[in-house]
Amino acid sequence: QQCAERGQSCNPYEGIECCGDILCIQPRIWPPVPGRCA
């Protein structure tokens, strides 16, 4: 299971989650867009 660190891009819809308790900040929820780990 690979995870993204702070500052990296994330996309829960593609299974790209942030590491640990880092949140995936997305500009909007729909349509799904890549976010940034913060």
From Swiss-Prot:
The modification Pyrrolidone carboxylic acid is found at residue 1. Optimum pH is 8.0. Alkaline pH values decrease the thermostability of this inhibitor. Keywords: Disulfide bond, Protease inhibitor, Pyrrolidone carboxylic acid, Serine protease inhibitor. One of its GO terms (molecular function) is serine-type endopeptidase inhibitor activity. Contains disulfide bonds. It comes from the Eukaryota. Thermostable. 10% inactivation is seen after incubation at 95 degrees Celsius for 2 hours at pH 9.0. Retains activity after incubation at 120 degrees Celsius for 1 hour at pH 3.0 and pH 7.0, but at pH 9.0 40% of the activity is lost. Inhibits trypsin-like proteases from the guts of the insect pests P.truncatus, P.americana, Acheta sp and Gryllus sp. This is Trypsin inhibitor 2. It comes from Opuntia streptacantha.
